[in-house]
Design a protein with these regions (language model features):
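Beta1-alpha1 glycine-rich phosphate/pyrophosphate-binding loop at the start
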Residues: 8-72, 137, 166-180, 187-194, ...
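Non-heme iron-sulfur electron-transfer modules
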Residues: 39-65, 79-109, 121-160, 169-199, ...
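FAD-site-proximal beta/loop scaffold in flavoenzymes
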Residues: 122, 126-149, 356-381, 464-536, ...
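Short, well-ordered coil/turn residues at beta-beta hairpins
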Residues: 341-342, 386, 490-491, 522-523, ...
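A short, basic/flexible loop-to-alpha-helix module at the beginning of a structural domain
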Residues: 1-8, 147-153, 234-254, 365-381, ...
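Phosphate-coordination loops involved in phosphoryl transfer and adenosine-cofactor binding
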Residues: 7-9, 81, 250-253, 321, ...
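A Rossmann-like FAD-binding core segment of flavoenzymes
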Residues: 65-106, 300-349, 361-379, 401-509, ...
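A conserved FAD-binding loop/helix module that cradles the flavin
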Residues: 532-557, 662, 741-752, 885-913
């Protein structure tokens, strides 16, 4: 056995009344107990009850002191929100693996103040109140929860848009905030991840949008334009970034080489961590490709400059016209770490005959000149762009705005293989750009040193090459010549890394060799990211690399091994098919009037696309289908005074060694939808008995007993006993285990809890008529028969008869018709009620049997855990050292469950003492 495992005398599985009793009995005998509960609080089902029968004592008043004693006992360790993965029997012990699910709240920091709950915008059905009312996604399970710690109910998935973003931005979060009119909060949420929302709102290719579930219907939510709206709204309000003081300074200095999206984002996150950051930029202006090559009509430079203020307002220095040629020099200047984010500022050339003719330029030179005002005069010229990527399309649309008579993009593969994003191609064609496919230039022809013609050859596609695209193959004899005045080569970009080749290792394509997980170079102080590592990518991909690098650089500077940490808090994307199967989805068309008229926009470099109005932004945000349980809007983070919210938490596997195991996993309730003839789930005024217990409990969700359908106070209530028990005809495999197809035994408690509820309803609704439909009344315990007779004396009606079905009246009242056989007369009758309560039976909860890896935990004929010697040693099971308590062994009321727990604790103590 490994020495680093946690060692206990006993493992108690389940934190209901039986589990607590067993744990306390053992703990009081000075045994160390590990209590594992799958819910967020101990208490089990008893804490949901109104009162207990037959004494009608308050259930919470009985169980909450026991909950407090259990939670505070020095010999009891609680593991909540946890599941048993495996239990493996050894010679004199058990090895246990436990999976503790994340709360996304630091349990040792949370004060239970509920501030997170107050600001959380998302409401979900409240399990504690049996889905009769709502609760927030950030919530404390119930008012009497113990421990009183909040939890963020993410349910293990994120929205597809969040999962898809390479930068870790939370589109669902800011969409929901825009929907609520919280534009500043939307901006702040974006700034938690990436500091250049203005640029992304205009020039991001929005991978989030391509994964939007709404896209499977009429069209995706216009996520990028929503971002553009709130970022511009914020920048209009704050034209200059507010200076943010970082109070905790580390004293570490980091040099960032390059001020593109990767460098800016890395500098931003490092500065937030308290490090001193200086960016070295070789160009005259900061911003990298954002500033130098993206056309003004797509991304105005004022937007880039305002984005950069988000970084410099943290104290980050940017030194332009400063080309770094030696990395060792930075170390000698006192920098503790270096981040290389040089981008891809070199271009590939065709290198064919005539390439040196005047009138042939690279795409980057062409776009840079256009951005700095040194624009080529293309008036009435015929322009060709060679290539099919994003820069090729940018160059083609720029050429149109510079007066070109005809602009043609020539690409050697088919349109499907063009690497440019499809919307950009469509916009270019709308403006008049011609796309010529399956052509390749083989010779430039000129006169007097100036380009005049291009010789092309036609291509066909063959088998896929290393890129996964079909290889273009020349067609013999297909050469032809076209007139041209100006050619822009846009056949690819390559990293600007050659200058560092003597100090760091490069791949053959010029990209930097890094640790793929940490972006560290050979375990040194140097890290690299962005296009210099990945090759040409998108803005958001490069920014995501910068964010990742900052995370690992911070670990390195804190003396930690970066390899020991996992970056990011993404969860798997929710299954879209489940979202699309919802019955409340309506169609909502997007806003299509998004562009300036074509004849206007091709004449200048002003914005092509319009910014949403506030009404348009909200309308677009309303189209969101709310895919995941948690919006990840991080309002809880902002509101928490204790800074306890932690979205980076992950599942934790805990190893334990225990000497004995007590199974007190309780029971399941029959799912009444498996008796469809009773209308549960179809008629809102048909509820189950646990829901009624919540309606009459002191901690009930409403101030009165109300029927769910319309909030009316019911005055004619029916109970149908034995719903899902004493019934061999039900296929209820969904509610039970795969082996359980019916539930022929009596659940023992249904009659009495129904009579209890009837008496409480007589007190809460003195004028109500209450009828209990039954086959037999099982009043077997002490005082139970008297309790039954008392209820009859109070006016509760009892009808001995089997209910066949429940239907709803068609008069709009929501009232219900019960069709039943009155066994006293043998006549089939009907009765009207305005609320029907199904007294559901108890089913075995035997899931724990699957967790024993090398032993078989036997079940009895009804699929409860088998008691080997029910009369002499009622807690013994088929595995030595494993004991059963409470309703895990069969139906029991609360007193019997407590007695059973005492028996299990006693037998476990005897077993432990004899080891």
């Amino acid at each position: 056995m490994s020495e680093n495992k946690n060692k206990y005398d006993a493992l108690v599985v389940g934190g209901g009344i039986a589990g607590q009793e067993a744990a306390l009995n053992l703990a009081d005998m000075d045994y160390k107990v590990l209590l594992v509960e799958k819910e967020l609080s101990i208490g089990g089902k008893m804490i949901q009850l109104s009162k207990v029968f037959p004494t009608l004592d308050c259930a919470a008043c009985i169980t909450t002191p026991k909950m407090s004693e259990t939670a505070r006992h020095p010999n009891i360790t609680l593991l909540l929100n946890s599941n048993i993965d495996t239990i493996e029997k050894q010679n004199k012990s058990f090895d246990v693996k436990i999976n503790r699910k994340p709360r996304y709240v630091k349990a040792d920091v949370c004060t239970g103040c509920q501030e997170c709950e107050f600001v959380c915008p998302e409401i979900r059905p409240d399990e504690y109140n049996t889905r009769l009312a709502g609760r927030k996604v950030a919530y404390i399970p119930f008012s009497l929860a113990n421990p009183r710690i909040a939890s963020i109910d993410r349910q293990g998935t994120s929205a597809p848009c969040i999962n898809e973003c390479p930068g870790g931005v939370k589109p669902y979060g800011y969409i929901s905030l825009v929907r609520n009119g919280q534009y500043e909060d939307a901006m702040k949420l974006h700034l938690e991840d990436i500091p250049i929302p203005g640029s992304l709102g205009r020039a991001c290719y929005a991978p989030c949008q391509s994964e939007c579930t709404r896209g499977n219907l009429e069209a995706p939510v216009d996520i990028r334009r929503i971002k553009r709206f709130f970022s511009e709204n914020y920048y209009d309000k704050f034209p200059d970034a507010l200076v943010r003081e970082i109070t905790k300074k580390t004293g570490n200095r980091i040099a960032v080489i390059g001020s593109g999206p990767a460098g800016l984002t890395a500098a931003y996150h490092l500065a937030l961590k308290g490090h001193s950051v200086k960016i070295f930029e070789a160009a005259p202006k900061a911003g990298g490709m954002l500033m130098l090559t993206l056309p003004e009509y797509r991304l105005p430079k004022r937007v880039v400059e305002r984005d950069i203020q988000n970084i410099t307002s943290l104290g980050v220095e940017i030194e332009v016209n400063s080309k770094i040629e030696h990395l060792t020099k930075l170390k000698s200047l006192g920098f503790d770490s270096v981040f290389i984010s040089v981008g891809t500022h070199n271009t590939f050339n065709l290198s064919i005959e005539g390439s040196n003719l005047e009138g042939i330029v690279s795409c980057l030179d062409f776009l840079r000149n256009a951005n700095i005002g040194e624009r080529d005069d293309l008036t009435n010229k015929k322009v060709m762009i060679i290539g099919g990527g994003n820069t090729a399309i940018d160059a083609s649309r720029t050429a149109l705005r510079l007066g070109a008579k005809k602009v043609t993009v020539v690409y050697r593969r088919s349109r499907e293989e063009m690497p440019c994003f499809a919307p950009e191609i469509k916009e270019a064609e709308e403006e008049g750009v011609e796309i010529l496919i399956l052509r390749n230039p083989i010779k430039f022809i000129g006169e007097n040193g100036k380009l005049t013609k291009v010789q092309f050859i036609k291509m066909k596609l063959d088998k896929p090459d290393a890129s996964g695209r079909r290889s273009p193959v020349p067609i013999d004899g297909s050469e032809y010549i076209e007139d041209v005045d100006f050619v822009i080569e846009a056949i690819g970009l390559q990293p600007s890394t050659a200058i560092f080749s003597k100090e760091i290792d490069l791949h053959k394509n010029g990209t930097i060799k890094v640790n793929e997980k940490t972006l560290q170079i050979s375990n040194t102080y140097i890290f690299a990211g962005g296009d210099g590592v990945t090759g040409a990518s998108t803005i958001i991909e490069a920014a995501g690399q910068g964010k990742k690098a900052a995370f690992y650089i911070d670990k390195y500077l804190n003396g930690l091994n970066p390899e020991d940490f996992e970056f990011g808090d993404k969860l798997p994307a929710v299954d879209k098919t489940k979202i699309l199967q919802r019955d409340n989805i309506t169609f909502a068309n997007p806003i299509n009037d998004t562009f300036r008229p074509i004849n206007e926009r091709i004449k200048d470099f002003a914005d092509v696309e319009k910014t949403f109005t506030e009404a348009e932004a909200k309308l677009s945000a309303e189209r969101c289908l709310d895919c995941s349980n948690c919006r990840e809007c991080h309002q809880c983070i902002s509101a928490c005074p204790a800074e306890a919210i932690d979205f980076s938490q992950k599942d934790e596997i805990i190893d334990a060694e225990v000497k004995s195991v007590i199974i007190s996993s309780g029971f399941k309730l029959f799912k009444p939808e498996n008796k469809p003839q009773y209308g549960y789930g179809k008629y809102p005024n048909v509820i189950d008995a646990m829901q009624m217990d919540r309606l009459i409990a002191p901690t009930r969700p409403f101030n009165a007993v109300l029927r769910p359908g319309d909030g009316k106070v019911p005055d004619k209530i029916a109970y149908i006993l034995c719903t899902g028990s004493r019934d061999s005809s039900i296929e209820n495999s969904m509610a039970c285990s795969s082996e359980c197809s019916n539930n022929p035994i009596c659940s023992q408690i249904c009659c009495m809890y129904s009579i209890k509820q009837a008496q409480l309803l007589m007190g809460a609704l003195p004028m109500a008529d209450i009828t209990i439909y039954y086959m037999d009344i099982r009043a077997f315990g002490k005082g139970y028969e008297e309790f039954f007779q008392q209820s009859k004396g109070m006016g509760v009606s009892f009808i001995k008869g089997k209910v066949a079905k429940v239907t709803k009246k068609d008069d709009g009242s929501g009232d219900l018709i019960l069709r039943y056989e009155d066994t006293a007369t043998g006549i089939v009758k009907e009765a009207k009620h305005d609320l029907v309560v199904l007294s559901v039976g108890v089913l075995p909860n035997n899931e724990i049997t699957k967790n024993f890896t090398n032993q078989v935990l036997q079940l009895d004929d009804q699929n409860y855990i088998k008691q080997i010697d029910e009369l002499i040693s009622p807690s013994l099971t088929s595995i030595e050292g494993v004991f059963v308590a409470g309703t895990a062994a069969g139906p029991k009321d609360i007193p019997d469950s407590i007695l059973s727990a005492g028996s299990a604790a006693s037998e476990a103590a005897g077993y432990i003492s004899n080891l």
